[in-house]
């Protein structure tokens, strides 16, 4: 209804713009009557006629529409008033369409336009609709004429208010627009000023950069010119240097060719002289063997002090007519070929080791390849050992001194640099060290290594043969790295829990030959670990001592010399060499001190385990393990421990001279107590050397610890000391034997005295507990340390000792052919100053 009314209103306004028709929503009160003419008497006649005509036409039209029964516009509640004619339409309607605000009222014209008023009849529709809607209502009573006046005044007030509001609104809008435009202009001015400033700065920077670029281009051009000039100078200098070098190379080549010819001539002459010398020595040896009688055992033992004499026993792996020492050494091509072979096999083994680490399950595929490679290398190793330089009579192992003052750089056995000065066979050492790592990782490979055969020869057999030849060589000192790698390989093979009898023999022979090479202290570190591993295999421990005769050993305490032969006991040789390994009165270097701690710890543990689970050669010596059926065993033991040192020492000396004949008579009271007398009569001193070497090693460890101001290795020294106090208590208190002080008596007593004093002084620092202190107290109160060394020894002992050894060596150096067969009277030895200087005045041999 509102939209329809709005359309009709717009149409009426367009047709008659000058007629002001106000249509408002009717209120609840009844609208005033439409036909009230009282309020319009003051209008003109034309207006009255017009309004009457409009009312009449509206009534007629309302009746017609009523008859039709349709009502299109409901204006029953609306009120239509005609206040006055105005330029534009003024009114308020309720519509949903938004219209612009009405324009301000215009000035009324001075004259009425009747044509415009009566031009169109459409405006009468509004009156007809109004009359039709309002007809059913009851006509109200006529009011006074003041209603028209009130309506006119309200309309005028509304117009005035609307005009004022519109003017104020337009004024405010204009002010806002003007203010907005001014602000916008100011912002644009500021932005323009900033842009002009930035433009100026950019221009300045561009000018500066352009200048810098020009300078850099000039410098670059200048440097390029200098570079080109320097290149030309270098090319000229290089050409000149090449010409000079070519001249010098040509001259050097001529000199080398001349030297090669001269060297070949000298080598030929030298080879000829060696061949003649060999023939001459053979003839001399044959003539001497015819005239010389069988040597006496004593003379045979004394002869071991000379390098040119031997024990008259051939080595199974060497031929007496081996003339390799008199032949010209292999040329450089053969040496290079062998080195390349070792390097090639080393690369293959490293590749196999890497695959084994990546895929441990591939050991089945890699096992034959690794063993085949090892067979080739060991075959070449045996050939290499044959080419070394060694003496003709290979009966006596040489002495290989080692300098404890030189600086060493120990990284790893597999490192490619040299571990020793003038080291040889470095690729072979690296190959064997890598093989040791593989065997330690895979037990199947170590087992296969002992069973694999190459050309009907076992791998370990070839290694033993090569090490035997290497031990007699003059170049053994240059192969200490190789020996250390072989010892590491042996230690890996000994880790196997169950060893076959054949494999035990091979491993023992390999261990023996490695010890007999008199290696460096670094090799002894691995050897001490091997001896610890042997404790798990009783069969190997039984092979340590073979009861070798006395003439297989020579021990010189004054000169620190220890000589032995191929038939010597392994344990005695190992213990004797270990005593001489770290003899030093000055502080060792830190690396050598740590090495001493490692070797000392391993050896003390080995000796202590030997007494905890004693093998046969120790059981035969211990007095508490004699025959159980002998009732006098305890008495014999007490008698033996209570016998004076001079009596037992006399028997020991006589036994060493007369090959046991006098020893049987002197030691007769103790034959029923234990079997040690029989053992000593046979000449083996494995038990004595094992005990004395433990004392010496412990003394060296404590002595070096004191020299290092008790700041380095305290934990290791404490652990060694706690084990050693148990060991020394067993050796010198529980199972004490007088034979321990037969040789080097005062030296051993001196070592023991110093060890006990150091332990007592630093017991807390070494971690001694009550059991250790009790055992230490027993050692201090033992009968072998009745007086300090400076009160017990005679002042002339060192002089007599040295003079006696000089006399023995001087007599041994004499060439005696027939006189050597004369037997020496043992009784004359009792009058010598050497033995009388070993005891106190009241216990002399006289």
From Swiss-Prot:
Outcome reported for the amino acid change (mutating residue 831 to D): In strain: MW27, MW38, MW56, MW63, MW9, NC304, NC322, NC335, NC336, NC357, NC358, NC362, NC397, NC399, NC732 and NC774
Region (Disordered): 20-40, 90-109, 135-162, 651-681
Protein name per the record: ATR-interacting protein mus304
Outcome when changing residue 141 to V: In strain: MW27
Phenotype for residue 802 to F: In strain: MW11 and NC390
Domain description: The EEXXXDDL motif is required for the interaction with ATR/mei-41.
Effect of residue 549 to H: In strain: MW27
Known tissue expression: Highly expressed in the oocyte and nurse cells from stage 5 onward and in embryos prior to during nuclear division 14. Then, it decreases to background levels during interphase 14. Weakly or not expressed in stage embryos and imaginal disks.
Subunit and partners: Interacts with ATR/mei-41.
Family: Belongs to the ATRIP family.
Residue intervals passing through the bilayer: none
Motif interval(s): EEXXXDL motif: 504-510
Impact after mutating residue 409 to Q: In strain: MW56
């Amino acid at each position: 209804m509102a939209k329809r009314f709005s359309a009709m209103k717009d149409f009426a306004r367009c047709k008659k713009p000058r007629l002001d028709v106000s249509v408002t929503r009717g209120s609840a009160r009844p609208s005033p009557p439409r036909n009230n003419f009282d309020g319009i008497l003051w209008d003109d006649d034309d207006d009255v006629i017009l309004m009457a005509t409009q009312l009449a036409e509206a009534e007629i039209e309302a009746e017609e529409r009523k008859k039709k029964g349709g009502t299109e516009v409901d204006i029953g509640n609306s009120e239509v008033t005609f206040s006055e004619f105005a330029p534009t339409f003024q009114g308020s309607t309720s519509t949903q369409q938004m219209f612009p605000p009405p324009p301000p009222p215009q000035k009324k014209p001075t004259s009425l336009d009747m044509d415009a008023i009566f031009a169109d009849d459409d405006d009468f529709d509004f009156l007809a609709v109004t009359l039709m809607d309002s007809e059913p209502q009851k006509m109200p009573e006529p009011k006074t004429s003041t209603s028209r006046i009130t309506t006119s005044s309200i309309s005028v007030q509304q117009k005035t208010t609307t005009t004022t509001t519109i003017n104020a609104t337009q004024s405010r809008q204009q002010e806002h627009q003007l203010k907005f435009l001014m602000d916008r202009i100011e912002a644009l001015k500021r932005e323009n000023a900033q842009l002009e400033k930035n433009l100026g700065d950019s221009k300045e920077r561009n000018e500066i950069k352009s200048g810098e670029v020009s300078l850099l281009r000039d410098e670059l051009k200048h440097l390029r010119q200098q570079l080109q000039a320097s290149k030309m100078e270098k090319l000229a200098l290089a050409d000149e240097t090449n010409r000079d070098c070519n001249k010098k190379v040509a001259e050097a080549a001529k000199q080398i060719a001349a030297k090669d010819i001269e060297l070949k001539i000298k080598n030929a002459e030298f080879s000829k002289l060696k061949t003649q010398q060999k023939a001459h020595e053979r003839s001399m040896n044959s003539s001497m063997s015819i005239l010389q009688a069988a040597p006496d055992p004593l003379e045979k033992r004394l002869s071991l002090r000379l390098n040119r004499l031997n024990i008259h026993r051939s080595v199974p792996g060497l031929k007496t007519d081996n003339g390799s020492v008199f032949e010209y050494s292999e040329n450089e091509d053969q040496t290079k070929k062998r080195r390349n072979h070792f390097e090639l096999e080393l690369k293959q083994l490293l590749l196999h080791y890497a695959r084994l680490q990546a895929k441990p399950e591939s050991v089945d595929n890699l096992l034959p390849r690794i063993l085949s490679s090892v067979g080739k290398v060991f075959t070449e190793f045996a050939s290499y050992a044959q080419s070394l330089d060694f003496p003709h009579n290979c009966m006596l192992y040489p002495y290989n001194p080692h300098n404890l003052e030189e600086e060493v750089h120990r990284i790893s056995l597999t490192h490619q640099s040299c571990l020793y000065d003038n080291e040889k066979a470095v690729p072979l050492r690296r190959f064997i060290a890598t093989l040791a790592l593989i065997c330690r990782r895979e037990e199947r490979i170590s087992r296969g290594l002992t069973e694999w055969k190459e050309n009907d020869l076992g791998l370990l057999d070839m290694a033993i043969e090569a090490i035997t030849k290497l031990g007699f060589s003059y170049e053994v000192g240059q192969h200490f790295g190789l020996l250390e790698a072989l010892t590491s390989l042996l230690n890996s093979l000994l880790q196997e829990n169950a060893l076959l009898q054949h494999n035990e023999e091979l491993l023992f022979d390999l261990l023996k030959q490695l010890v007999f090479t008199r290696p460096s202290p670094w090799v002894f570190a691995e050897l001490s670990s091997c001896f610890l591993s042997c404790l798990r295999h009783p069969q190997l421990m039984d092979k340590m001592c073979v009861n070798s005769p006395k003439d297989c050993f020579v021990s010189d305490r004054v000169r620190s010399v220890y000589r032995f032969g191929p038939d010597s006991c392994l344990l005695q040789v190992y213990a004797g060499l270990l005593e001489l390994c770290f003899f030093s009165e000055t502080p060792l270097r830190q690396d050598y001190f740590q090495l001493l701690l490692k070797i000392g710890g391993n050896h003390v543990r080995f000796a202590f385990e030997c007494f905890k689970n004693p093998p046969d050669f120790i059981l035969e010596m211990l007095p508490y393990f004699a025959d159980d059926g002998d009732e006098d065993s305890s008495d014999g033991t007490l008698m033996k421990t209570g016998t004076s040192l001079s009596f037992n020492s006399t028997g020991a000396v006589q036994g060493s001279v007369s090959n046991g004949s006098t020893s049987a008579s002197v030691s007769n009271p103790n034959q029923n107590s234990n079997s040690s007398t029989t053992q000593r009569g046979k000449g083996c001193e494995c038990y004595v050397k094992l005990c004395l070497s433990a004392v010496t090693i412990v003394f060296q460890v404590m002595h070096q610890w004191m020299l290092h101001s008790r700041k380095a290795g305290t934990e290791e020294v404490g652990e060694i000391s706690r084990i050693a106090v148990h060991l020394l208590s067993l050796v010198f208190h529980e199972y004490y034997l007088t034979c321990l002080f037969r040789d080097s008596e005062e030296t051993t007593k001196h070592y023991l005295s110093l060890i006990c004093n150091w332990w007592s002084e630093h017991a807390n620092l070494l971690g001694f507990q009550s059991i250790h202190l009790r055992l230490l107290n027993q050692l201090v109160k033992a009968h072998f340390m009745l007086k300090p060394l400076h009160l017990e020894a005679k002042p002339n002992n060192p002089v007599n000792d040295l003079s006696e050894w000089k006399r023995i060596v001087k007599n041994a150096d004499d060439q005696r052919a027939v006189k050597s067969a004369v037997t020496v009277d043992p009784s004359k030895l009792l009058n010598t100053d050497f033995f009388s200087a070993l005891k106190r005045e009241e216990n002399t041999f006289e």
